[in-house]
Curated annotation (Swiss-Prot):
Known function: ATP-dependent rRNA helicase required for pre-ribosomal RNA processing. Involved in the maturation of the 35S-pre-rRNA and to its cleavage to mature 18S rRNA.
Family: Belongs to the DEAD box helicase family. DDX47/RRP3 subfamily.
Domain Helicase C-terminal, residue spans: 312-460
Chief location of this protein within or outside the cell: nucleus
GO CC terms of this entry: cytosol; nucleolus; small-subunit processome
Gene Ontology biological process terms in this record: maturation of SSU-rRNA from tricistronic rRNA transcript (SSU-rRNA, 5.8S rRNA, LSU-rRNA)
Domain remarks: The Q motif is unique to and characteristic of the DEAD box family of RNA helicases and controls ATP binding and hydrolysis.
Bias (Basic and acidic residues) ranges: 496-506
Chemical reaction(s) catalysed: ATP + H2O = ADP + phosphate + H(+)
Assembly information from the UniProt record: Interacts with the SSU processome.
One Gene Ontology molecular-function label: RNA binding
Protein name according to UniProt: ATP-dependent rRNA helicase RRP3
Location relative to the cell: Nucleus
Amino acid sequence: MSGKVDKKKGSSVKKTEGKSKEISALAAKIRAKALENQKKMLKNSETTSDQEDDPSESEEEEGSDSEDVEVSKDKQEEEEEGETFESFSDLDLVPELIEACKNLNFAKPTPIQARSIPPALQGHDIIGLAQTGSGKTAAFAIPILNRLWHDQQPYYACILAPTRELAQQIKETFDSLGSLMGVRSACIVGGMNMMDQARDLMRKPHIIIATPGRLMDHLENTRGFSLRKLKFLVMDEADRLLDMEFGPVLDRILKIIPTQGRTTYLFSATMTSKIDKLQRASLTNPVKCAVSNKYQTVDTLVQTLIVVPGGLKNTYLIYLMNEFIGKTIIVFTRTKANAERITTLANLLEFSATALHGDLNQNQRTGSLDLFKAGRRSILVATDVAARGLDIPSVDIVINYDIPVDSKSYIHRVGRTARAGRSGKSISLVSQYDLELILRIEDVLGKKLPKENVNKDAILTLRDSVDKANGEVVMELNRRNKEKIARGKGRRGRMAARDDMDKGER
């Protein structure tokens, strides 16, 4: 009997080794194609530099694009009337804040900061409307910290954010700007230990950054914690807070915290009827600071699309990963399953990828983001949980593997690149089923998206290799799912449901 078992084991080991060698060969084949393409690109760039006196057709097109950018910039500047400031020293800020801005290389206030900080410093409630990547976190953090310097007390300000990742990033901004002021902050989000968070709250932080569901849990259950003396309330990404059905929780929070002596800031990408209703219920005579009152993207973002034939989306994606080797890429998918599959496929083919989606626990999600931010992974494959608020400065490319179902999500996805004046590129993979969606997006943008230039012959040579690797991935993920089911993974109940709500994914 034991001999038979050993033979079977030996056979399965040989099969596994065979598959491993085969996949390694596929990865090497794909990498060789990438190297070949890079050499061609280098050759072309050398040829182009030799022909500087005789500009090519593509250079003429590039010049016309830059003219369009200048026109749109002029138009934007006409729309954005109001006072401009050459540096943060021009604002009435305490020296510690001005010094912190210098240390963070904040050269001068962005348009939303220039518009909202002066009235905020005068004590007004603020409605801030600005496109993603415009510097709105600092727009509310700076006036809060400036006032805190003169009136230090615990539980001074509470910032509500729709996702854990955004909450953590807001905390980092407050910690950086308040580094010379001894500011204490706490991040209170779902998916983390309630007792640890209760201990953080008992240390009496000045600034609390929270997702609404978890904040409500602590207001109801954590002894000694109260926001009765709260001076500032901020609702960041307010449109997203309402889209994620936090409305009832927000209503309960607004009833608990004081109205007298409280300053409220509401920041959103758009002004909708829901936002209008929320601001009427929570703000008093607010000053409206709008840098943009419609869906738009920044001028430094190049947006293109690729019409993908049926069954070739994986191949096109791997081709693009090859083309942009050395660049930082975020790939957006509509489902958690696709995010996990694409991450596994990319890693199997020896790319450097990590996933971000709602099936990961908080530590795993934080770990993924840290790997990507630190440059230890060049590709982040994410669902829309990551599309709002994530401030990763050096994202070069955004790829929409799945086209989002609404224009707002598209704007927020592509807003992960070309942030704070940097250039960036987004590429959307459009199947025959996505044509209606992309037409809607183009209608909102007010322009047609040009087609990305691709080498179709190079793509077709990758097809068999990618399909074979994807088949291996599907089998591996099915095996993992069976193991999870066998283990009876997952706790449920009231707290788990609340944590799911904070994740921002259904």
